[in-house]
């Protein structure tokens, strides 16, 4: 018969005699070799309400044996809620799963937590049964063999080492997924980061590390952990490795910038050179200039005697309106006619698109985007310089980082200065291109200029091809008519 049954029998006896309840039985002593010797027995349950109450209080329980640990429970084994726990002070028989909250250390005046501290507010929360909580939220399954019939002790399974989770469950899970893709130990991973070694880790992995840098709250939680760090989960251990490095998130961002720097600079330089080449090719094409003059003459001929006549030039977007004016039979546009005249009188101008080989590529580049990338690169380099300065006073762990960063900066700063100079030159060339066609660069940006020119080239080439097909078609039709006429004459002569 266990202690709880003894207590129930005692209570029933007290009810029947209407006297004060007897003292609870002393705890049973267990041999030192027993499997239960390390866990003290629970204290007696509070007595139930008696049918006939007396003024005599129940005697205190007898003193515990000197070898028992019930007199000095540790904070790791006893639930310490201030109220609302049934059997407060009961010994926990198992580790419980944590509730990943962010606790407040101070009740702000006027908050509900301050109100809850009042004695009259404490009773509003329901009572919690410790045994039920242990049953539902135990971190490991409780062994049923330790409390089987008659106190018989069965063979206990070897306890599994349970990992301690301090980080919110979903975040820890996602972090461990990320870490599963990194095939090197965590200390070696951080050593590669501090060495700025791009052969071990790529930019995507570095960016993922940045996403999982511990927050201020998580850092405080980990720093406050006083248990065995070997029992922490992989996410927590990863966070601890990160926290060993001063300003770890800034260093990771510097590493990410370094990895991407050369490819970004190469792309920027390629785009700027394409724009520079396109502007020089367009402005240097004498064939395009003569075609523009031919269009001006054609337009003045059509608009003679009207307000549109006697023009000294035209806006660039007027090039695309050459297809709007059609012949009386609607079979030919003004663009077709321009191509026809050039083919007959100035055939050497028809291949003017070959003078502007960079034009099409330039239409795929946004000068505004290049400006934003250029600014981002400059600001990124400024942050690298700031971290380089800050790492001078770091501990030994940042020594290699500082040394490798110095080598990178010696190259990167020169690259950015060269790029800034090229950008300034290209910006001036882009504005000059709009001015070349008599446009205001503020109203007609570079992108609009090259887009209009490329569309004009495309329509011009298509119209010339259509003219050539039409000429070939008419030539074949004339030959066929001539053959038919010849056949008719032959039949007539025979008759």
Swiss-Prot record:
InterPro entries named among the record's database cross-references: FH2_Formin (IPR015425), FH2_Formin_sf (IPR042201), Formin_homology_domain (IPR051144)
Top-level taxonomic group: Eukaryota
Biased composition (Low complexity): 30-39
Spans annotated as Disordered: 1-92
UniProt cross-references to SUPFAM superfamilies, sorted A to Z: Formin homology 2 domain (FH2 domain)
Domain FH2: 86-486
Xref: SMART domains: FH2 (SM00498)
Residue ranges with Pro residues bias: 19-29
Pfam families assigned: FH2
Family affiliation: Belongs to the formin-like family. Class-II subfamily.
Name of this chain's protein: Formin-like protein 17
Organism: Arabidopsis thaliana (Mouse-ear cress)
């Amino acid at each position: 018969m266990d202690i709880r049954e003894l207590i129930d029998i005692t209570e029933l006896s007290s009810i029947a005699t209407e006297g004060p309840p007897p003292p609870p039985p002393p705890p049973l002593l267990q041999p030192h070799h027993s499997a239960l010797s390390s866990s003290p027995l629970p204290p007696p349950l509070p007595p139930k309400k008696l049918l006939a109450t007396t003024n005599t209080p129940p005697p205190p329980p007898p003193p515990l044996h000197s070898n028992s640990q019930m007199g000095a429970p540790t904070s790791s084994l006893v639930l310490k809620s201030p109220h609302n726990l049934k059997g407060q002070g009961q010994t926990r028989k198992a580790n419980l799963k944590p509730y990943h909250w962010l606790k407040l250390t101070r009740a702000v005046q006027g908050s509900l937590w301050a109100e809850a501290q009042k004695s009259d507010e404490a009773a509003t929360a329901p009572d919690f049964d410790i045994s039920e909580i242990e049953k539902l939220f135990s971190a490991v399954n409780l062994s049923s063999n330790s409390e089987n019939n008659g106190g018989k002790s069965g063979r206990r399974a070897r306890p599994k080492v349970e990992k301690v989770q301090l980080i919110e469950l979903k975040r820890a899970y996602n972090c461990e997924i990320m870490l599963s893709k990194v095939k090197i130990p965590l200390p070696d991973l951080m050593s590669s980061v501090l060495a700025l070694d791009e052969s071990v880790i790529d930019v995507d992995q570095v960016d993922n590390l940045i996403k999982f840098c511990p927050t201020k709250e998580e850092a405080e939680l980990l720093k406050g952990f006083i248990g065995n760090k070997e029992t922490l989960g992989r996410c927590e251990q990863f966070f601890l490795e990160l926290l060993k490095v001063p300003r770890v998130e800034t260093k990771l961002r510097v590493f990410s910038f370094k990895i991407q720097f050369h490819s970004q600079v190469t792309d920027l330089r390629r785009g700027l050179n394409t724009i520079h080449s396109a502007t020089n090719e367009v402005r240097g094409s004498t064939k395009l200039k003569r075609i523009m003059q031919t269009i001006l003459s054609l337009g003045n001929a059509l608009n003679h005697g009207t307000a549109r006549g006697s023009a000294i030039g035209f806006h660039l977007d007027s090039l695309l309106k050459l297809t709007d004016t059609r012949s009386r039979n609607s079979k030919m546009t003004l663009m077709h006619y321009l191509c026809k005249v050039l083919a007959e009188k100035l055939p050497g101008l028809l291949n003017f698109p070959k003078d502007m080989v960079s034009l099409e590529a330039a239409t795929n580049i946004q000068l505004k985007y290049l400006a934003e990338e250029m600014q981002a690169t400059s600001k990124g380099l400024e942050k690298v310089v700031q971290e380089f300065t800050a790492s001078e006073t770091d501990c030994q762990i940042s020594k290699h980082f500082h040394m490798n960063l110095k080598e990178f900066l010696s190259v990167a700063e020169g690259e950015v200065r060269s790029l800034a100079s090229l950008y300034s030159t290209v910006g001036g060339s882009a504005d000059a291109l709009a001015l070349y066609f008599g446009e205001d660069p503020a109203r007609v940006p570079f992108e609009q200029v090259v887009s209009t020119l490329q569309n004009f080239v495309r329509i011009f080439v298509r119209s010339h091809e259509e003219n050539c097909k039409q000429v070939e078609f008419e030539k074949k039709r004339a030959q066929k008519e001539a053959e038919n006429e010849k056949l008719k004459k032959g039949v007539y002569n025979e008759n």
